[in-house]
Amino acid sequence: MEIQIERLTTTEAAVAAGVSVPQINRIIDEKILPEDLYSTSPTRTFRTDAALLIAFYFETADSLTTNARLEAIRNAKMRCSSWSEWKDCTVGDQYLTIRFSDLWKEVDQRLRRLSEARAMVVEDPEILSGTPVIRGTRIPVHDVAAQVEAEVPIEEILEMYPRLSAAQVALASIYAAAVPQRGRPRRLSIPGATVVSMTKKRLRSSSQGA
């Protein structure tokens, strides 16, 4: 299935490329990519295929010079345009050949997972005043992702949310990374629980601050 070229926010681009948000911002601040791959107005957004070149730029930092990476990006951009073309895109000369196929598969998989995560979440004014929830439930997606971030074992998370599957929990984590919670974080609401055991990491933080 062809992935449609669309716009990604900085956080979505970070998820798709497998890099950090500061690295994503560097791409624009340092004008690393051709300008038609991103926009800065009204907000910073990227074309979907930019995620592949962002991943390439950072993943090859230890093996290629900055100039070599920039030249490869320019040459690849001239040869490949559609997402399917990027799969077999190859650039180089008699001294160096760069094939994007393996990296394309990784980015393509992340993009598909991101699409699945988006499709799993709904925002309905009639459900928790529009709080993003997992489709078919009233479970806030960011609450589930917070448990993953806190390193709560998946078995415990599934006990807290018996209506969810392990796959949905994984997608919740992806969604939260791509679409961070707006405003002040909500207090976690865990079904059927009045006391929540804290992770070792949280316990350590509490003891240090006592």
Predicted regions and their residues:
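Residue-level detection of the helix-turn-helix DNA-binding "recognition helix"
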Residues: 25-30, 174
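Short helix-start
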Residues: 34-60
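The alpha-helix within a helix-turn-helix
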Residues: 14, 158-159
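Pre-recognition alpha-helix immediately N-terminal to the DNA-recognition helix
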Residues: 23, 52-53, 140-143
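Helix-turn-helix-like N-terminal two-helix hairpins of bacterial/phage DNA-binding regulators
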Residues: 21, 31-36
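Basic Lys/Arg-rich amphipathic helical interaction modules
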Residues: 1-5, 58-125, 129-135, 139, ...
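Polyanion-binding surface elements
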Residues: 2-23
